[in-house]
Amino acid sequence: MPQNEYIEAHIKKHGRRLDHDERKRKREAREGHRISKDAQNLTGFRAKMFAKKRYAEKVAMKKKIREHEQSKVNGTPKEHNPEDGDALPTYLLDRQQPNSAKALSSSIKQKRLEKADKFSVPLPKVRGISEEEMFKVLKSGKRRNKSWKRMITKHTFVGEGFTRRPVKLERIIRPSALRQKKANVTHPELGVTVHLPILGVKKNPQSPMYTQLGVLTRGTIIEVNVSELGLVTAGGKVVWGKYAQITNEPDRDGCVNAVLLV
Amino acid sequence: MATLLPPPSKKQKRLAQEPKDLDLIPEDLPNVLVRFQASDTGENTGGSVRVPGAATEKQLEMLLNQLQETNDDPTPYTFSVIKGEGDEQTLIDITDNIWASILKPGHKSTEDQLTIVYTPRAVFKVKNITRSTAAIPGHGSTILTTQFAPHTSSRMVSGSGDFTARIWDCDTQTPMHTLKGHSNWVLCVAWSPDGKMIATGSMDNTICIWDAVKGTQIGKPLKGHTKWITGMSWEPLHKVKEGHVPRLASSSKDGTVRIWDIGAGTYLRTMAGHRSAVTCVKWGGIGFLYSASHDKTVKVWDPESGRLQHNLTAHGHWVNHIALSTDYALRTGGFDHDTTRKDFKASDTELRTKALEKFNKLANTSGRISERMVTASDDFTMFLWEPEKSTKPLCRMTGHQKAVNHVTFSPDGRYLASASFDNSIKLWDGRDGKFVTTFRGHVASVYQCAWSSDCRLMVSCSKDTTLKVWDVRTKKLLSDLPGHADEVFAVDWSVDGNKVASGGKDKMIRLWSH
C-alpha cells in the first residue's frame, strides 16, 4: 500500500515525462486490440469477470444508442418513465410544473428526515476581526480633542424604522452608505440564487455586540424573507423567514452573498 | 412611543353620523300569504296559509311538518321563495326569517302571495372531522387516487405510483389486499356501484378488474387503449339489465372513450371523436355518456349505439373535469348512509330498484327527471349544462383566477364546489350556477374536494400539504388538518360520513375522523 500520494507529489514536482501524451494516445488507440486479445485468451475466473463487465458495457451502450435514436425520431419530451421521478395524478400529467418551490420544500423535508446536524453551518470558522479594523475613531469636541465616537467600517443591516440618536448621544455610527437591505441568497441544493430582503442579523460570530449592531461580515447568520420562494411548513403555512450564512466579505464586494441553511 | 392612529377622514366621519340599519323586525308587520311547493315534484302542499311576516325558518319548518302530518318525526327543510315569472324565475333562499331574506331586500312585498319551495335536508348529520386517526404506510410511491367503497366506510381502495392498488380495512386501519398486475402507475380507481368490483386504470394503457372482497383479479387486463387511462366510470346500477354485470366506460390520453364488457373482457364500443386527450368520462343516469377533452369540447354519447348525441363547445381551453348533479346517486347505487351497516343484505334486484328510486328522487326537479352537468376548464371558468334540454349552457361561472381542476356537486345537487389552482375553492348554486361564496385558506393549489353525504361539510386537499374542512352553512373554515408531509393528491369522504381518506406524495394513506 502506498503510504502517501508520492506519485502525484512527484508529478507535481518534476512534471510528466515528455512523451507522456503520445504514449497515452497510442495506448488508447490499441485499446481495442487489447480487449480482443483478452476476450480470446483469458480463461477461468478472469474470463468470467471480463465477460460480465463487457456484457454490461454493451447493454449500456445499446440503451444509449436507442435513446439517442428515439430522441431524434419524434423530438418530443421524454415519456413518463416509471422508474425515475415521482408519480403524478392524471390531472397534473400534461402540465408544465413550476418545480422550484416544490423541490425546495421536499428537499428541506428530506433533510429533516435525515436528521442532519442542526448546528452545522457551511462556514464553521472565520477570521477574527479586531476592534481597530471594525471601528474608526472619530474626533469630536470644539477642539477635536475628544475621541469617544466610533464609526463602523463594515457593512451593516439597520432595521426598518431606525432613527439615529441625537449627535451628542450617538456613540457608534453606522454609515448609511454601508447599509444593506437585501442579500443574494443561494439555495445550496438547487443552485439557484435569489435576491431576498434581509429581516435581521441573528448571529455575528465575532462578538455579540456586533450582532446587536447588525454588522454584516463573513460567517454572519442572517434571517432572510423567503416568501417569494413559496415554501410551506408541515402545518401548511407559508414559510417566510429562513436563516442564511454570509459567504463573502461585504465590505470588499459591496454586496451581500449568502447561502441558505436548510 | 405608541403609534397614534390618524384622525378619521371626512368620509369616515360622515358614515359614522349616518343612521344605521338595525336588524329589528318592525312591530306592525302584517301577515303574509304563503303557499308551500315541493322542490322535487312541484306539487303544492296544503292551501294558502297566512303566516306572520317575521316567521323564521324554524317556524316554517314546524308549520310544514304539521301540514304534512309528520309532527312526531319532523323532517328538516330549507326554504326558498320563487321570484319572477316563466323563464326569469329565480329562487331566493330564506336564511333567517321571511322579513330579513325576502321583504326587507324588496324581493316581494307583504301584499304578494309567496310561493315557498321547500327541500328536505338530510336527516342525519355528519360530524366534523378533526383528527388523523391513522397514517398507514405501505405504498412504495406517491398515492395518486383514493376511493371509498359505496356500501361501507370500512373499505377503501388507493392507487399508487408503485404499480399497485391496495384495498384497506379502515376499521382496523390495516391493508387487506395488494392488487398487483399493472406494470406502471395506477392512475385511477373506480369502485362499482354494487360494491363487488374495483376497476383500476393505469399508465401502462390497461384496465384491471378486481374482486373487491377477495382481492383477486377478474379476467385478464383489458387492453385496447394506446395511451394511459385518464378516467373511468361504471354503468349506473339502475341501467344495468337484469342478470348482467355493469359495464365500464374508460377515457384515455389517446383521445378515445371505450365501453368494456367485463364478462367477456373485450370492448363493446369505441367512441373516437375527440381530437385530443380525453380527460374525464361520466356515465349519466338518464342514458347519456359524457366525456371532456383537451380539444375544448364536451361530447355527449349514446352508450348503447356509441353514437355522438351532442357536441358541447363553449370552453376556450382544455376541459378538465365533469361533475353530474346525480353523481352521488350513481356512485352509491342502491346503498345509502343507512345501509352501510355491516349486517345489511340485499339482493341484486333490490339494490337495482333502490338505485332507481334514489336516482329518480335526486334527479327530480320540479316534477321532471333531469341531470345537470358542470364542466371545469383551463380557461378559468365552468359551464353548467342540461344536455337533455339544450346544447347551450345554462350558465357560465366565472371568478377563478387560474385553471379550475375539479368540480363536485353536493350529494343533493344543491351546491357545487370548484377547486382551482388559484388556491381557492368557490361555492356555487347547483341549480342555476349563481356564485355563493369563496373559501380561502389554502396557500397553494387546491387539487380536489369531497362532500360529506349530508351536504353540510366539504373537505379539500391541496398542494400545501393540508386538508381543510369547510362549513357550507356558515361559509367558514371549520377545521384545518395538517399531517401530510407533502402534497395531497387525493381525498374522499366515505358514504356514511364517518371517515375521510387522503393520500399524496408522502406515500402515506391517512384516515381522518371526528
UniProtKB/Swiss-Prot annotation, chain A:
GO BP annotations, alphabetical order: maturation of 5.8S rRNA; maturation of LSU-rRNA
Location of the protein in the cell: Nucleus, Nucleolus
Keywords: Nucleus, Ribonucleoprotein, Ribosome biogenesis, rRNA processing
Location of region: Disordered: 1-39, 61-86
Motif (Nuclear localization signal 2): 51-58
InterPro entries xrefs: NSA2_fam (IPR039411), Ribosomal_Se8/biogenesis_NSA2 (IPR022309)
Keyword Ribonucleoprotein attached: yes
Primary localization class, coarse: nucleus
Motif (Nuclear localization signal 1) on chain: 11-18
Regions of compositional bias (Basic and acidic residues) in chain numbering: 18-37, 61-83
GO CC field: nucleolus; preribosome, large subunit precursor
Family: Belongs to the eukaryotic ribosomal protein eS8 family. Ribosome biogenesis protein NSA2 subfamily.
Xref: PANTHER family: RIBOSOME BIOGENESIS PROTEIN NSA2 HOMOLOG (PTHR12642)
Functional note: Involved in the biogenesis of the 60S ribosomal subunit. May play a part in the quality control of pre-60S particles.
Subunit structure: Component of the pre-66S ribosomal particle. Interacts with NOP7 and RRP1. Interacts with RSA4 (via WD repeats).
Protein name in the entry: Ribosome biogenesis protein NSA2
Organism for this UniProt entry: Yarrowia lipolytica (strain CLIB 122 / E 150) (Yeast)
